[in-house]
A protein has these predicted regions:
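Short, small/polar residue-rich loop motifs at catalytic or cofactor-binding pockets
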Residues: 84, 198-201, 223, 272-274
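Glycine-rich phosphate/pyrophosphate-binding beta-alpha loops
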Residues: 98-107, 201, 205, 216-228, ...
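Active-site-proximal alpha-helical segments within enzyme catalytic domains
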Residues: 35-43, 115-116, 207-216
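Noncatalytic scaffold domains of N-terminal-nucleophile
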Residues: 1-54, 58-101, 105, 165-166, ...
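N-terminal accessory/precursor segments of enzymes
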Residues: 1, 101-121, 266-294
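Active-site rim segments in enzyme catalytic domains, especially the processed small/beta chain
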Residues: 71-73, 213-283, 287
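Internal maturation/activation junctions in enzymes
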Residues: 119-220, 233, 248-249, 256-257
Length: 294
């Protein structure tokens, strides 16, 4: 049970009782009651986003940050604004794919991997055959090398999305592919790291009887984020700073490598790998998909 496994972390990082620890271990059938979180959500329901970024809750959040020597201020919270961006759309085998744009790398990676793998006509290979697996792995290697080198918050870097998903660019990227051997890492990209599996993040895909489709991916980054629960607020503080490139070329907690494009800067949004995606067929939702880990 994850709550039991992380009990010591909750006790270590919180000076106050939280809903996530008990005197005895959690067992199947136990009910997790989060009263403080319920009050916070009711407040947001009544007052909207202002209830979170200003007023009582903002005071609680900043107080919690100060306890951990954090630097977020009331002014930081008040000045924060969500930003709507146009979805990334591209065609693939008579389907229209709608996915997430920068500052998530997910949509670009999906487009790159689908287009590069199509150069080898995967349909002629049996599912999970060595040939099919090699094509997919090599497409992923090239895409993630581009992620490390080119991708970040488009408010801070040049947005090279259209170049990265163009037919001409991807054919050039695929030119050194061979079934005879794995492409040497030095030929795949400049910034390479070992892969690492993760179990964090939540995704939901919904389609209703009217044909409305929603794909939502949400995360705290690590398991339970920073494991710090805001006293009086009942919610976790995330540890999304790790999604920035703290040191170019060095992998983060998930093994993802970043470069200068994703370095830490004030007011910058970190690069993620979220890939909530809707596939359209003849203009109507056909598949709604997404996954933890991007």
């Amino acid at each position: 049970n994850l709550l039991n496994e992380t009990r010591e972390d909750f006790l270590k990082h919180n000076s106050h009782p939280t809903a996530f620890t008990k005197e005895i271990p959690w067992k199947k059938g136990d009910i997790l009651v989060q009263k403080e979180l319920a009050q916070t959500l009711k407040l947001i329901q009544k007052q909207g986003e202002k209830a979170f970024y200003e007023g009582k809750n903002a005071q609680l959040l900043v107080s919690e940050m100060k306890r951990g020597n954090g630097i977020i201020t009331l002014e930081d919270l008040k000045n924060y604004k969500t930003k709507e961006r146009k979805a990334l759309q591209f065609d693939y085998k008579n389907h229209e794919i709608v996915s997430m744009p920068l500052p998530s790398s997910g949509g670009i990676l999906l487009a790159q991997m689908l287009k590069m793998s199509s150069f080898e006509n995967l349909e002629k290979y049996q599912q999970n055959s060595p040939e099919a697996v090699q094509v997919m792995v090599e497409a992923e290697r090239r895409a993630f090398a581009d992620r490390a080198e080119f991708m970040g918050d488009p408010d801070f870097i040049e947005d090279k999305t259209q170049m990265l998903i163009s037919e001409e660019y991807l054919k050039n990227r695929w030119e050194n592919f061979s079934f005879e051997k794995a492409t040497p890492s030095a030929e795949v990209g400049k910034i390479i790291a070992q892969p690492k599996e993760s179990t964090e993040t939540t995704h939901i895909s919904i389609i209703d009887k009217f044909g409305n489709a929603v794909a939502v991916t949400t995360t705290l980054n690590g398991l339970y984020g920073s494991k710090v629960v805001v006293k009086g607020g009942g919610y976790f503080l995330n540890n999304e700073m790790d999604d920035f490139s703290v040191k170019p070329g060095v992998p983060n907690m998930f093994g993802a490598v970043g470069g200068e494009a994703n370095k830490i800067e004030p007011n910058k949004r970190m690069l993620s790998s979220m890939t909530p995606t809707i596939v359209l067929k003849n203009g109507k939702p056909y598949i709604v998909v997404g996954t933890p880990g991007g």
